[in-house]
Amino acid sequence: MKRLPLLLALALFACSETSTPLPSTPTVDPVTSTSVPPTPIPVTPTPTQIPPTDTPSSAGTFPDPNAYTWQLLVSGLQRPNDLQADGSGRLFVIEKVGRIRIMQDGQLLEASFLDITDRVGSSGNEQGLLGLAFHPQYAQNGRFFVNYTDKNGDTSISRFQVSDDPNVADPASEVQILGVDQPFANHNGGVLVFGPDGYLYAGLGDGGSQGDPFGNAQNTGVLLGKILRLDVDSAEPYAVPADNPFGNEIWHYGLRNPWRISFDKLTDALYIGDVGAGEWEEIDFLEAGSPGGTNFGWDFREGAHEHEGNAPDGLTDPVAEYSHSEGGCSVTGGYVYRGSMPEWNGIYLYGDYCTGFIWGLIRSDNGFQDQMLFDTDVNITSFGQDETGEIYLVGDRGGVYRLERIQ
């Protein structure tokens, strides 16, 4: 295990700007409402236009959302917050308290795939079992990785092994590959994803409180407020890839709380949903093959807007953003659709935890365009994507849904 301590004096935790309130007693998410007209949500100021590739249409049009629904598949989960596929047709859903459950053939299996509630600290709204990633060769090596906060509130990125039973992991197989001290109970990030290069990417928030009081996001000697990139195959517990820009685990920086990131299955482009502070939520984007070292601006900027001032040159603005004045509070990054409905091909779907709104983002001949498509009743904690490219919605109150065409 590698552990990077933060030798910082703790202050009293005050996070009215930063901590998203979550329901304390979960109930089943109601079935979503999908009859909202496609009202465009403006982005101001307009981010720098990026030349389009692989667009669903040259005009940048969206499907009529009234012809689609988010179909409830299972309910009764305990505060689910992530969904991943292992390539077998099964879906794996994280419960914040420290369990991973299996969805198979449309049913939620009773037994947990993994139960590590004995080592997960989940008392804080942004703490718990937060991320899951299956190794690209999972079918051969049975390895998967999780990101959780431990009983001390610190981040643990750990590797586990499946048992001889494919529906049961071995909780005693844990190898902690990276531990990071957390100065506060919020902004833990939590996402894990394997990139097209085979490396493991991890999103970490800026350490919490409010306003990044220790300047972590802009400090390339500290892992907080970053996207990390680890080679988990070449050494134990991992190696730092030779082309990481700062000679350490950091790949990109200047992020507040990158709760969910994903790579487009077709183009390998990277999308980042970075949770904002008091005013703006943002989606960041990088072309496939982009080098490391991108500075996304926090806390000089919140979204594309000045926050602390004195911003240096070379910051990368988001390609989409929305204001809290529209009712939102916390962006949940999603996925680019690559499933069986061609009219959705190439559209990146993302949402907001508080409003339940779901937007589409596409690259057209005019650059990036976004539009609010669905008004749901779901506190959106995550999206998921299976091996066929279909997209799922995960709700804090216990439901999992799939985007489907109304017959």
Question: Model-predicted segments: where are they?
Answer:
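Sec-dependent N-terminal signal peptides
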Residues: M1-L22
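Ser/Thr-rich, Proline-interspersed low-complexity disordered segments
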Residues: C15-P65
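Acidic, Gly/Ser/Thr-rich repeat motifs that build Ca2+-stabilized beta-propeller blades
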Residues: I50-G211, R260-F263, D268-W280, G327-N366, ...
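Surface-exposed loop and turn segments in beta-propeller and other repeat-based domains
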Residues: A111-N125, A172-G189, V232-W251, F296-E326
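Beta-propeller blade signature
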Residues: I157-D165, N216-V232, L286-E287
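Acidic/polar, solvent-exposed loop segments in beta-strand-rich repeat domains
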Residues: Q210-V222, A239, P291
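Loop-centered beta-sheet repeat module
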Residues: V222-L230, V240-L266
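Conserved blade-ending motifs and adjacent loop-strand segments that build the rim/top face
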Residues: G367-E387
